[in-house]
């Protein structure tokens, strides 16, 4: 599959389960070497396949190419193979992914919010991405030792030291980013809700180790041995989302929850632009069917004019003449997606 996209944006129109999301996901993987729908790339390679898959494209006036096979990834920029993912990511693009499942940011489990933070923090701090990968490996190894149940205290403690090293970095970056997100997301929330509406968004970072990883590991060790898993650390971090001081998951309406999710994603875009000193690409996966006209228009009005926007949708009934004119939609690429095939342009 090969397609050429206008710099301003592109529309991909088609019924559900025709392959629209896979196109946006491919763009995301090319830019960030990761998918917003999966924590790791290897599960995306078929179990019985030795070939894997590859993606290539142009971004930031550079030719990007990546390939993934079982246990291996290869990356090129302008034809030169790069040795590390960090090198590649310094020159590839930034991404904001928006989907109709984003409401889970508000009403879903803490894991959804941690994944949101990981995707954002990894784009603005190269050291974060490295620490996250190492933390996950060490956590898995330590949990295996705890499950073994034998006299492995020395080994468990050694892995604990590594958890402290990587976990402290993850926690400090997450806490700082949540602090930066709050005023931006709160401002967007008020803008979308409209004047006269009393909807104050709040965010609170809650450390999964109480702010002191070493003390937490020492305190919970006996419980860990009984439960055979690591009980403290960034893998237990939480971000509390509040509406007028109350838990948004319990007290916010469905509409308020969707507005909060939009605000969080749009605030993410602002932080990426400020920290990365360039506009991210916005990938909007079938978000308009779940939004009323007010939120739909507010979302499009908040997308930066100079950013590229790729949108999937089952129809364009939501695209009013006024909104189309504002977005200069006539300059966009437009494709029809059917059974994995793409036509138009």
Stretch-by-stretch model annotation:
Residues 87, 91-92, 99-165, 340, ...:
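A conserved P-loop NTPase coupling/switch region
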Residues 28-112, 121-128, 182, 186-187, ...:
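Nucleotide-state sensing region of NTPase/ATPase domains
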Residues 285-287:
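Walker B catalytic acidic pair
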Residues 52, 93-95, 114, 236-238, ...:
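Structural motif
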Residues 20:
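Conserved lysine of the Walker
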Residues 1-15, 29, 151-281, 290-294, ...:
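Conserved NTPase motor "head" modules and their coupling/switch loops across ABC/AAA+ ATPases, GTPases
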Residues 16, 34-38, 48, 121-124, ...:
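Flexible interhelical turns and helix-capping residues at alpha-helix boundaries
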């Amino acid at each position: 599959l090969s397609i050429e996209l206008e710099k301003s944006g592109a529309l991909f129109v088609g019924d559900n389960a025709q392959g629209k999301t896979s196109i946006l996901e491919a763009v995301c993987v090319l830019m960030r070497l990761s998918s917003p729908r999966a924590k790791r790339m290897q599960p995306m390679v078929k179990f019985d396949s030795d070939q894997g898959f590859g993606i290539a494209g142009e971004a930031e006036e550079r030719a990007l190419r990546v390939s993934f096979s079982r246990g291996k990834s290869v990356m090129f920029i302008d034809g030169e193979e790069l040795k590390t993912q960090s090198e590649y990511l310094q020159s590839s693009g930034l991404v904001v992914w928006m989907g109709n499942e984003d409401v889970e940011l508000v009403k879903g489990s803490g894991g959804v919010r941690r994944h949101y933070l990981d995707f954002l923090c990894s784009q603005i701090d190269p050291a974060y991405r490295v620490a996250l990968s190492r933390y996950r490996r060490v956590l898995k190894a330590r949990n295996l030792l705890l499950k073994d149940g034998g006299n492995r205290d020395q080994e468990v403690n050694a892995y604990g030291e590594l958890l402290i090293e990587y976990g402290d970095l993850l926690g400090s970056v997450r806490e700082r980013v949540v602090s930066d997100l709050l005023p931006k997301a709160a401002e967007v929330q008020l803008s979308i809700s409209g004047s006269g509406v009393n909807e104050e968004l709040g965010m609170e970072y809650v450390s999964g180790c109480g702010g002191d990883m070493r003390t937490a590991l020492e305190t919970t060790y006996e419980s860990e041995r009984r439960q055979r898993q690591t009980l403290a650390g960034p893998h237990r971090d939480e971000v509390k989302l509040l509406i007028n001081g109350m838990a948004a998951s319990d007290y916010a309406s469905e509409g308020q929850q969707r507005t909060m999710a939009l605000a969080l994603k749009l605030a993410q875009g602002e932080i990426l632009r400020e920290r990365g000193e360039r506009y991210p690409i916005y990938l909007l996966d079938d978000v308009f069917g779940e939004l009323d006209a007010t939120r739909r228009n507010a979302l499009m009005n908040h997308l930066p004019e100079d950013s590229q926007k790729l949108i999937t949708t089952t129809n364009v009934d939501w695209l009013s003449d006024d909104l189309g004119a504002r977005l200069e939609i006539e300059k966009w690429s437009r494709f029809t997606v059917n059974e994995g095939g793409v036509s138009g342009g």
